[in-house]
Swiss-Prot record:
UniProt record similarity statement: Belongs to the SHO1 family.
Name by which UniProt lists this protein: High osmolarity signaling protein sho1
Residue intervals passing through the bilayer: 15-35, 45-65, 71-91, 104-124
Subunit structure: Forms homooligomers.
Gene: sho1
Residue intervals on the Extracellular side: 36-44, 92-103
A GO biological-process term: regulation of actin filament polymerization
Localization per record: Cell membrane
Amino acid sequence: MAKFRASNILGDPFALATVSISILAWLIACIASIISDIKTDYPNYSWWAVAYMFCCIIGVTIVFGSDTGLVYGVAVVGYLSTGLVLTTLAVNTLVYADESSSQAAAAGFILLSMVIVVWIFYFGSSPQATHRGFIDSFALNKESSGAYGNRPMSTAFGPRPDTMSTSAPQMYTSAQLNGFETSSPVSGYPGGAPGSENRSSSQARFGNPSASNVTGNNNGQDEVPQPTEYPYKAKAIYSYDANPEDANEISFSKHEILEVSDVSGRWWQARKSNGETGIAPSNYLILL
């Protein structure tokens, strides 16, 4: 589990406001319940609501502090739904009491119920939801995929390299090259830098140029050459687990820096720091 950081709460206005209001509401309900229990017959199950909501507030605070809302969102919604039932039942009993302390406890439970409804709406929504992206946009230490999922690609980096071409590399004869032969007719393909090998090794590698060209044209549509240049860098705003049935996908963790060669479409060709290459969903990444 991610480490708890107070800055995740202090830097998030939504988390700071809702957690603060929930703590205040719980204190009102708890203190008023103690006073009401001394003066009158206080319903026993309302104490369970007080204890249960204390645990829920602690749990939500930990989720906000560790920034794991996407991981534990479903569990949080389930626990909060139970808490909403308990606080509503407590309000229904206490709000009609004659004792002012019981009515104050009911007010605390009403405020707790309102915060619970807001939390359920937040954690129960997908990260791409408009309202969640808007809320997360105010956080200093959180980046929402919804804010970048549909944004236009920046043109500040110039035209993207054509690294995903399916056409086979053009082969030339020695007469056409007129002494400018290299070990590879296209930079980045096996053979190293230009001039690193002599002409004989180039002929041994490619054999008959015309035969290689025919073979390349036949197989070029089936095999996609891997790009060798990754001019862009992207930061992962969410963790992603690759589909085990798709060997082309790669997994990465949140805040990991990836090198990207192609920034068109919904899937980007990327390379990790350990050299692993594959495709990654663009709405999980943001260009640096």
